[in-house]
Amino acid sequence: MMKATFYNKRLLCYIDDTDFTDYQGIGADPMYLRYDSVYGIVQNHIAEEYRDFLARPFFEDGLIYWYVAEWIETPVQLSELDSSKKEHYEQIKEETLKQYANALSQLNADEYNILSSALKYINDDFIYCYDDKVVLVAWGM
């Protein structure tokens, strides 16, 4: 298993790409291979505090490794949180999704297609919570 190194990022988890069947993509490439295209839109249209929502993927040998901003508090899946913490992070998730929805309404057609494909499936099992932020792995799948 080879690991990538990304500045200020840390490996959170990995998934097998065969676990998913409905890949979103750009041309023939699945979204996880077009992170730079997606992040370019995020960087230009999303407030800085919400830009880390989409984890950075790295694909190798059938596995997709997901990297996120460095953490202090150990990340936990949203679906696994106890009720008090879950309520707190649900609110952060809703604020984050609102930012992305507002951005979608202002994008040109190409940017809209790219970002909406990345956000098509959002499942709490793939949202990790830490340090008062939420991040999504397995996006665009």
Indicate where each model-derived feature is located.
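Cytosolic/nucleoplasmic/matrix-facing N-terminal domains/tails
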Residues: 1-141
